[in-house]
Amino acid sequence: MAIWTPGEAVLATDSKVTLSGGGAVLPAEQSCKIRTSGRFFYAIAGLYNHAPTGFDAWRLAEGAIAGATSVNEAASRAERRIQPALEMALADIRRRDPQDYARRYAEVWLAIWIAGTERGDPVMAGREFLPGRTVAREFPGASGAGAKGEIGIAIFGERQAIDSAYGDVQAIGRLVEAKGPAAAARALVELEIAGEPEKAGGPISMARIRTVRTTTGGAEWIERGLCAGPR
């Protein structure tokens, strides 16, 4: 979950990772889904790794984001690093196990969202890798959601329970206005965990960046969950 307002950007995730192999669903694992690289927070959902092709989304993202000077540059660099390796991995999965591919990756392959600051203000950029195309999004945008004074919302990862409860992004926007970005993000992740326990599970991890005129840009963990380490 990524939520942006003019004064605050929040990333929130669950920790459950579902695995599969040879057509069989394997026991779920727990993992941190928010990482840091330099002055950026970033979160990934979708295919994290694929051993037969050596695909590792976290390693590729870290290498791309580390040298970036802006959030949008970080997202563009991550796209260039991830996309060819991801296409190779998904082609191999589809060849080896077409049923697993259809069940897990027919609509969305992977999404990455990055949060940071520019001129002291929170900025977010994302890439959603879909079969046949990649969608680029950024908050604030030139117009529409995420424009000045508006709210930017992106649901990535499991979302069926959220969609069933709220129906559209405008309803989620009203929740953000009522509760604030952090409380709304937590409520939405909790809703997804309760609604799809076979696919989503705690603990929750949350990070945010607020408008603060300091060198850190107001970057902080709200709740680490399984995300250990500095900051």
Language-model region placement:
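N-terminal nucleophile
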Residues: 1-231
